[in-house]
Regions:
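Mature-chain termini and adjacent capping regions
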Residues: 1-249
């Protein structure tokens, strides 16, 4: 019982001399020298680490480099970028505390909470200083009613600009735009297409007609029932006559 409690309470706070950043981490087990920041430290089992700008949970975490500048996480990675207000999940992560660049690998899901943007890809590299994310392979980004996809993308968080390439596509409700390169301003909703441009756009009249057809469908059954009542008035009269006969008897 005492051993389990000790492992659960392994929480070490370090003050980096160079970067003046406090690091807090915990795990079920640890190997390495906690007081020596020039060695590699391994955390395994419910590994957790928190810096001033990043919070990470994973099956295992490795800390290395001078003042533990390199952080590697493996297995069911869940994290938050506290400064950028972004949350993410992935299979593995590499983060450099000095450059503040994080690379998320495998089944990456990234949520930009400030702009209500969700991004998915196999690899996402996020530069915290520049507020720029580079998405690679199976890119899918959703913002409001817009669904954007491609093989490569650059997402500018501050300006809300998205650059798509490689079978690039932007779908805005019923409208679809395809090109080799797409530049999409998510603030103004302006789209610039370049190379092998294709698109399908519904005009306002078509959209209005489609909406009217949808509104008419639920009333169709009532109309048919009313028509049947008008076409067969004798049925109602016969029932009335039978009721009168019954009362007379």
């Amino acid at each position: 019982m005492g051993k389990k409690k000790y492992l659960f309470l392994i929480i070490i706070s370090l003050l980096s001399k160079v970067h003046a950043e406090k690091i807090i981490f915990s795990a079920n087990s640890m190997t390495g020298q906690a007081g020596n920041t020039n060695t590699t430290t391994y955390l395994s089992g419910n590994a957790y680490i928190k810096t001033d700008s990043m919070e990470i949970q994973a099956d295992s975490i490795e800390l290395s480099g001078e003042d533990y500048k390199n952080i590697k996480a493996q297995g069911k990675v869940v994290g938050k970028n506290l400064e950028a207000n972004m949350e993410f999940t992935c299979d593995s992560l590499d983060y450099n505390r000095v450059t503040k660049v994080a690379q998320l690998n495998g089944n990456v899901n990234l949520d930009d909470k400030d702009n209500d943007v969700n991004a998915k890809a196999e690899i996402i590299t996020y530069n915290q200083e520049e507020d720029i994310a580079i998405l690679q392979m199976k890119v899918n980004l959703v913002q409001k009613d817009n669904v954007c996809s491609g093989s490569y993308a650059v997402y500018y968080k501050k300006t809300q600009i998205l650059e798509l390439s490689g079978n690039a596509q932007v779908k805005k409700k019923d409208d679809i735009f395809r090109a080799q390169v797409i530049n999409f301003d998510m603030n103004t909703q302006d789209i610039k297409l370049g190379g092998n441009v294709k698109g399908t756009v519904k005009d306002s009249k078509e959209k209005q007609n489609a909406e009217q057809e949808n509104d008419l469908q639920p009333n169709q059954q009532n109309i048919e029932e009313n028509q049947q009542s008008v076409e067969n008035p004798e049925t109602k009269d016969d029932k009335s006559k039978e009721a009168v006969k019954g009362e007379t008897q």
